[in-house]
């Protein structure tokens, strides 16, 4: 699985793509395969080191995405594999697969594309 990694705070060219192991969800979590990502000002500030909360380095940036459930280890049966969802979370969405707690997941409304 590929992920964008920020090894140090700085301009966008400090970012690089890294091959990583596919994450495994624990109880209460879901494995999501993003299909669309939001890139916003907070992401840029985090990479630059200018946001009020600084993630531990190195980190995978990205706070929001939309994609499909791959595995559901939560107690919510609404998130069956293949379900289209939106996620908002701590940094980490700029990856091919992301593990998130169920509280960070909401279904994509019917009729809305990703």
Predicted regions and their residues:
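Short beta-strand-to-turn element immediately C-terminal to the catalytic PLP-Schiff-base lysine
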Residues: 6, 47, 70-73, 99-101
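Cytochrome P450 core scaffold surrounding the K-helix E-X-X-R motif
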Residues: 42-48
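NAD(P)H dinucleotide-binding glycine-rich loop of Rossmann-like/cofactor-binding domains
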Residues: 45, 84-114
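Conserved hydrophobic/aromatic beta-strand scaffold that supports enzyme active sites
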Residues: 17-22, 66-68, 97-99, 105
């Amino acid at each position: 699985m590929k992920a964008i990694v920020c090894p140090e705070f700085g301009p966008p060219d400090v970012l690089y793509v890294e091959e990583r192991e596919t994450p495994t969800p624990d109880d209460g979590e879901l494995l999501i395969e993003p299909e669309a990502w939001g890139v916003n000002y907070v992401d840029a500030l985090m990479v630059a080191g200018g946001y009020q909360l600084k993630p531990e380095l190195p980190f995978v940036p990205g706070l929001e995405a939309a994609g499909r459930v791959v595995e559901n280890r939560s107690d919510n049966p609404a998130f069956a594999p293949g379900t289209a969802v939106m996620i908002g979370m701590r940094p980490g969405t700029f990856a091919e697969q992301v593990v998130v707690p169920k509280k960070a997941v909401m279904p994509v409304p019917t009729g809305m594309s990703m």
